[in-house]
UniProtKB/Swiss-Prot annotation:
Its cofactor is [2Fe-2S] cluster; Mg(2+). The modification N6-carboxylysine is found at residue 125. Disulfide bonds: none annotated. This is Dihydroxy-acid dehydratase. Homodimer.
């Protein structure tokens, strides 16, 4: 296959004289028209520390592509900052941005007949957005993570942005003074890079490394270290070789490689958002995957890494301890990883791991020995019951009380709930319900980091449950259950909950139950009316019309 297998349609022949004329204006010479044209999709932005270092990485990617004999073409895609928009109306655009990113990369690459694409992302939705596009297009592709932020430091503590969210709850509960709150604000985010714990961005980048779509060790590098830039240049070279070898995303993104990714997510204690995003990636790659598959994998894979939000360490510590390859090698040796899966380098997972030690360095405790795991089984549990017949997702690591039955405290928006928590109106034993925040109802399925952090900060993390048809940040922990489906806006049972109803959350039995008779629920359902759309124009209105259930990945192109 010719290296310029797609771009030749715009570079060859007399009829393409005008096309070549425009390409000459952006730097092409006579010798370049037979080279593969490789897109560099850059999510550089100064609205968030997650993405503010990506421009320099994009330049290194271009250099790598050129050195390997390709012609890079740089273009931009968007990002939003989940951390900055958290707790506001703006957070409704976060999950929407995943699909905008996917659509934008697909649009540019296909419009310009690119032979391959290297995407660089930082904030949470950059990763799944780029991978969805790659899986859809199935042209040679590689993902480069912009890198994790280094931890902040204050009074001997490692800080992350979640420290600041939790400090708000502590301050509101009278457990922290304003000077301490201000100090944490100043020290939590010391520079460039994505939020530092095993939150959503680091979870997804780690999963892509495990899946074979990113270079090994690249997902845990810090954004500001030289090795991140060097790895990015190498990724450009590897992609050009993948074009020559005709290695496509769907050769790599298979059922087995997705199982590998999910296994690593469980082992590192990753974000609940990974469930939503991998359902969407599998849909784009036409790989059969259901929400129940996560539960199957959870039951066989232990949590091996002691990482924030519920653990001790940050992702930079994981890198020093051996990174994702060390975790993968342990899973491979235990028969929990498919070693025959292809990677973007052309080697298999087993081949790439052949030089990785069988056991972690005994002089660190970020990665536990396989026979001494943090938890014997995975932490992302799929709960079902009359409140979530299609399923819901709970992160059960660090939960001291895995079962709670209590009175429902019902809120139809995140803001109303947060106000109640900060005003001291939530009591131990309560089960908070935040509804009409799902993919359709929000729309956009906001993350509930502000309420959950306020609960933790108020000292209620072990005594209060929270369920929602919205999402949770990767920084959330506690007795919280999200992605409840069907959601309230489409008539799910969560819409029928009334203040004071008894609700049971049982992580051991994987049960989410409204303790109300079927007769009473039928009577309530007969009276229920769907709410009017919150938006009738613009991207949120379009999204609400197109988006599927969270149990199907909240995708916007499921038409059959």
């Amino acid at each position: 296959m010719a290296e310029n297998w797609r771009s030749r349609i715009i570079t060859e022949g007399i009829q393409r004289t005008p096309n070549r004329a425009m390409l000459r204006a952006v730097g092409f010479g006579d010798e370049d028209f037979n080279k593969p044209i490789v897109g560099v999709a850059s999510a550089h932005s100064t609205i968030t520390p997650c993405n503010m270092g990506i421009a320099a990485l994009a330049s290194r990617a271009e250099a790598g592509i050129r050195a390997a004999g390709g012609m890079p073409q740089l273009f931009g895609t968007i990002t939003v900052s989940d951390g900055i928009s958290m707790g506001t109306e703006g957070m409704k655009y976060s999950l929407v941005s995943r699909d905008v990113i996917a659509d934008s990369i697909e649009t540019v690459c296909n419009a310009q007949s690119m032979d391959g694409v290297l995407a660089i992302g930082g904030c949470d939705k950059n990763m799944p957005g780029a991978m969805i596009a790659m899986a859809r297009m199935n042209i040679p592709a590689i993902f480069v993570y912009g890198g994790t932020i280094k931890p902040g430091h204050w009074q001997g503590q490692d800080l992350t942005v979640v420290s600041a969210f939790e400090a708000v709850g502590q301050f509101s509960a009278g457990k922290m003074d304003e000077a301490t709150l201000h100090a944490i604000e100043h020290h939590a985010c010391p520079g460039a890079g994505s939020c530092g714990g095993m939150f959503t961005a680091n979870t997804m980048s780690s999963a892509f490394e495990a899946m074979g779509m990113s270079l090994m060790y690249s997902s845990t590098m810090t954004a500001e270290d030289a090795e991140k830039a060097d790895s990015t240049e190498l990724a450009g070279k590897v992609l050009v070789e993948a074009i020559r070898k005709n290695i496509r995303p769907r050769d790599i993104i298979t059922r087995k490689s997705i199982e590998n990714a999910i296994s690593v997510i469980m082992a590192v204690g990753g974000s609940t958002n990974a469930v939503l995003h991998f359902l969407a990636i599998a849909h784009s790659a036409e790989v059969p995957l259901t929400i129940d598959d996560f539960e199957t994998i959870r039951q066989r894979v232990p949590v091996l890494c002691d990482l924030k939000p519920s653990g001790k360490y940050v992702t930079a510590d994981l890198h020093r301890a051996g990174g994702i390859p060390q975790v993968m090698k342990m899973l491979l040796n235990a028969g929990l990883l498919h070693g025959d899966c292809l990677t973007i380098t052309g080697e298999t997972i087993a081949e790439r791991l052949r030089h990785v030690p069988d056991t972690p360095d005994p002089n660190q405790d970020v990665i536990r020995p396989f026979d001494q795991p943090l938890y014997a089984t995975g932490h992302l549990a799929i709960l079902k019951g009359n409140l979530a017949s299609e399923g819901a997702v709970a992160k059960i690591s660090g939960v001291k009380n895995p079962q709670i039955t209590g009175p429902a405290r019902v809120f139809d928006s995140e803001e109303d709930c947060l106000d109640a928590i900060l005003a001291g109106k939530i009591n131990p034993g309560d089960v908070i319900v935040i509804r009409y925040e799902g993919p359709v109802g929000g729309p956009g399925m906001r993350e509930m980091l502000a309420p959950t952090s306020a609960i933790i900060g108020a000292g209620l993390g072990d005594s209060v449950g929270l369920i929602t048809d919205g999402r949770f940040s990767g920084g959330t922990y506690g007795m919280v259950v999200g992605h409840v489906a069907p959601e309230a806006a489409v008539g799910g049972t969560i819409a029928l909950v009334q203040e004071g109803d008894s609700i049971t959350i049982d992580a051991h039995r994987r049960l989410l139950q409204l303790n109300v008779s079927e007769e009473e629920l039928a009577a309530r359902r007969a009276k229920w009316q769907p709410p009017a759309p919150r938006y009738t124009r613009g991207v949120l209105a379009k999204y609400a019309k197109l988006v599927s259930s969270s149990s199907l990945g909240a995708v916007t192109d499921r038409f059959v």
